[in-house]
Design a protein with these regions (language model features):
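Generic N-terminal amphipathic, Lys/Arg-enriched alpha-helix
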Residues: 1-28
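Glycine-rich, small/polar surface segments that engage phosphate groups of diverse ligands
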Residues: 43-115
C-alpha cells in the first residue's frame, strides 16, 4: 500500500501518520549493512581514498550535505582528513555534460576523470533506478571501486551494483529521503565520534 492513499482531516493527523511511516522506514534498515557501510568508509578514509557521492533532486541535496558533514565534521577534533566530493554540486560541469553529452552521464563523466583505485562511490536514489546514478555505479563497479547505495522503493538496479546496499523500505519520497539523510548523519557523526577523546565528546554539540 502506498502512503498516502487518501486525504487526511488535518495536517496534525497527517503528521502522526507520516512519523509512523518514518519510524517504520528507520527500523527497516539492515544494521549489519550499516556496519558494512561504516567499515567501507572507514577503510577508504584511512588509506587516503576519496568518497564520491551523487544523487538527483532531494538526493542531490543529501549528497552535498554528506560532503559537508563528512569533510568538515569528520576532521573536527580528530586526526582524520576525509576527502569527500559531491558530484551533484558543480552546476557548470553538470550542465555542460548534460547539454553537450547526456544528462545520463553527468556523474560517470566526472568519475572517469577523478576516481582512482581505493576510492568509494556513494549513490543516493530513492528508486535506486535513476539512469545517471546507475551508470556511475556500474562504471565504479567495473573499475573495482566499492559502491555504497542508499536506496528505497524496490531498490532498482542499484541494488545489484552495490557493494553495500543500504535499503529503506518505503514508497514515499519524503520518508525515504528523510531516512537517507539520517543514515548520512549517523555515519558522519559516528566516524567522528569513534576518533574523539572521551572528554571532548561531552563538550561538543553534534
Amino acid at each position: 500500500m502506498t502512503f498516502p492513499d487518501s486525504k487526511f482531516a488535518s495536517v496534525a493527523d497527517y503528521a502522526v501518520a507520516y512519523f509512523d511511516q518514518a519510524k517504520a522506514a528507520a527500523q527497516s534498515v539492515d544494521q549489519e549493512k550499516l556496519e558494512a557501510a561504516l567499515t567501507c568508509l572507514d577503510a577508504a578514509y584511512e588509506r587516503g581514498g576519496t568518497i564520491y557521492a551523487c544523487g538527483n533532486g532531494g538526493s542531490a541535496a543529501i549528497s552535498n550535505h554528506l560532503a559537508c558533514d563528512h569533510s568538515k565534521g569528520g576532521q573536527t577534533d580528530t586526526d582524520l582528513k576525509p576527502k569527500v566530493v559531491s558530484l551533484s554540486t558543480n552546476m557548470e560541469i553538470i550542465t555542460a555534460i548534460a547539454n553537450d553529452i547526456s544528462f545520463d552521464d553527468i556523474f560517470v563523466y566526472q568519475l572517469r576523470t577523478l576516481a582512482e583505485d581505493g576510492d568509494v562511490l556513494l549513490t543516493i536514489s530513492s528508486s535506486g533506478d535513476s539512469e545517471n546514478v546507475v551508470r556511475a555505479a556500474r562504471w565504479a563497479k567495473e573499475k573495482g571501486l566499492d559502491v555504497i547505495a542508499f536506496t528505497g522503493f524496490d531498490g532498482g538496479r542499484s541494488t545489484k551494483l552495490a557493494t553495500v546496499n543500504l535499503h529503506v523500505e518505503g514508497d514515499n519520497y519524503g520518508v525515504v529521503e528523510d531516512t537517507h539523510q539520517s543514515l548520512m548523519h549517523i555515519l558522519a557523526q559516528y566516524i567522528r565520534l569513534k576518533r574523539m577523546d572521551d572528554g571532548t565528546i561531552q563538550e561538543r554539540k553534534f
